[in-house]
Structures are given as C-alpha cells and as structure tokens.
C-alpha cells in the first residue's frame, strides 16, 4: 500500500496482516530535526493485527478443563514472532473484545476482582508481545464503565462515576487504547483518546541501494459498533452515547493529517456491511473505508474469515478502493 510521506519524498509500502488469537500513552520519540530523505527512498512496514482475543490467553477450554488448540494468544504469539522475523519493520495492533469471553474474564471481573494495583491477565500477556495500539470492542463494556475504566486506567468523565480527579489511577495496558465514537453525555468528548500519533523510525532503502533509517508518524484511530447502546444499555444509557463511524472519521482524520500523520490506520471493531449507511449500523466499515485520508483499515468483531465467497461479492474495503484487502483469519464467537 504505497503512500507519500508527508515530511519526505519517501515511499512506504505498508502490508496489513491479520493474526487472530480467536477465542500508553503516545509512546512517541520526537526529534527537533528531521533528516533529509532522498527522493525514491522506499520502505515496507508490515501491520500485524489481533482481534477478538476474548481473554483466551492460553489454548485452553475453561469449561471442558482441557487443552484447545484452536484458540490462544500463546499460539498467536508464534505467528507474531514469525511475521516479525520475515519483516524488518512491523507494528502490532488489536481490534478489541479483549477482556471478556472466558471463565478467566468473568473470574477477574466478577468473582475475584483484579486489584487496582494489578494488571489484567490478558494485558500482561499483550504487553509482553509489545502491542503498539488497540481499539475497544463492544464486549469491553459488558462489565460496566467502572471496571473498564479501572483495567484500562482511564478516568471516565461520566454521570454515574466520581469526578475523574477522584478516581484512582490503576494498572492498565502499556499500549495506547483509542476509541473515537463513544462520547460522554456530560461533555460530549470521547471517553478514551480518539486517536494517537506514534513516532517510529523504520529501516528503508535509498535509491543507491544503501540502508537508511527514516522517521514516520503513524496515526491510529479506533471505532466500536454504535449498537453497544442496545447491547449494554444498562451500563451505558445516560452515561455515554455513540457517533457514526463516517461522521467521526471525517471529524478526526483531517486533524490527524494536520498534526503530521504520514499514515492513518483505522481500527474498527466491526465488519463490512453493504447496506445503506446509518450512523447506528453495527458493521459500517465499507462506508468507513471511503473516508478520505484513511490509508489502512483493520477490522474484527464478526469472527469470520474475511475473504469468504460472500465477502468477495462485497465492494472493496480498501481505502478509496485502490488497494487489495488483506487476507485475514478470525474465529468463533
């Protein structure tokens, strides 16, 4: 997926790869000087994605109490390692539905609640793998906003929680979590940071064949299905509301570009639906993909292999329909 670097005449080829385990901050390294990059310099950046981990840390069925080789972040870790070995430059993202889905998730949320001073088990594993950023899935809201705020170390400004300044700062994941289309009813602002700009240095090849290092700023924006307002009405009604994927992207993507994003990655916990667009639709990614400025779209939620015969009959989800969609693997709900 070639795109022109905003700050240099380099070409970046970004290949998106989806790895599904199935069931913090900006991390920026800013510099006051930008090195000159020769015209024709090229690089390849592999974007790796997990989705719908659902607290499947190990390949284990907690109900049957036996190993299950079809699931597990431990198994996906080997795929991540292999992809990193094959590509000099990689970034790792997650598309949400992380904290709920197994007995372990319920145990840490409902039976023996994870302490504020401890990190959720799945986040410990993900931090070991070195994720760069991730979105928020619909199942993140299943245990309520207080619990979600605790395990992600977010002090939500919502009606039914204490003022943010009074909320404890707890252990959350080390990577940036982004969500643009869920906003507080108190101030109309997103309850998570809507996007993050990540400064990275990647290996590239100069026109003369020599190896060089070039800076790149990767913008990452997150979305979740607006239908959470029905699915988790008891936890969300009166506290938050949602905005449509297209409208939200049209608001923030130009802002990300204006701040210097060379590439904009949209992580949307949803799938492609060729129905007419609605701001409340569950799987609005065919429409999201058409928003100008989005270079990469990473999806999840549907627990299906993306390029099925039915999916191939849909319009392209590649931004501006100019790039082939990545082959992806998802899993059962």
Outline where the language-model segments fall.
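Alpha-helical transmembrane segments
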Residues: 12-16
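Bacterial signal peptide processing site
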Residues: 23-26
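Composition-driven, intrinsically disordered low-complexity tracts enriched in small residues
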Residues: 28-30
């Amino acid at each position: 997926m070639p795109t022109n670097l905003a700050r240099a005449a380099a070409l970046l080829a970004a290949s998106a790869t989806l790895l599904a385990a199935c069931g913090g901050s900006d991390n920026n390294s800013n510099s006051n000087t930008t090195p000159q990059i020769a015209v024709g310099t090229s690089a390849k950046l592999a974007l790796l994605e997990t989705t719908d981990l659902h607290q499947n840390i190990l390949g284990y069925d907690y109900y049957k109490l036996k190993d299950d080789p079809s699931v597990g972040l431990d198994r996906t870790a080997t795929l991540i390692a292999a992809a990193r070995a094959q590509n000099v430059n990689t970034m790792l993202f997650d598309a949400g539905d992380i904290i709920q889905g197994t007995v372990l998730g319920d145990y840490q949320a409902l039976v023996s609640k994870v302490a504020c001073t401890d990190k959720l088990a799945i986040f410990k594993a993900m931090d070991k793998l070195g994720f760069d950023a991730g979105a928020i899935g619909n199942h993140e809201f299943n245990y309520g906003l207080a619990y979600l705020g605790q395990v992600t170390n977010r002090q939500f400004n919502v009606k039914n929680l204490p003022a943010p300044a009074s909320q404890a700062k707890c252990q959350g994941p080390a990577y940036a979590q982004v969500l643009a289309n869920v906003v507080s009813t108190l101030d109309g602002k997103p309850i998570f940071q809507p996007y993050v700009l990540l400064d990275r240095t990647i290996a590239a090849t100069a026109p003369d064949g020599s190896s060089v290092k070039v800076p790149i700023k990767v913008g990452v924006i997150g979305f979740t299905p607006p239908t959470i307002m029905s699915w988790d009405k008891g936890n969300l009604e009166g506290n938050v509301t949602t905005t449509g994927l297209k409208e939200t992207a049209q608001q923030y993507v130009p802002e990300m570009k204006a701040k210097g994003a060379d590439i904009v990655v949209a992580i949307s916990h949803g799938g492609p639906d060729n129905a007419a667009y609605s701001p409340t639709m569950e799987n609005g990614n065919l429409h999201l993909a058409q928003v100008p400025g989005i270079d990469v779209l990473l999806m999840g939620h549907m627990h299906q292999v993306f390029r099925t015969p039915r999916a191939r009959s849909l319009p392209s989800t590649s931004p501006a329909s100019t790039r082939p969609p990545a082959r992806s693997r998802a899993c059962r709900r």
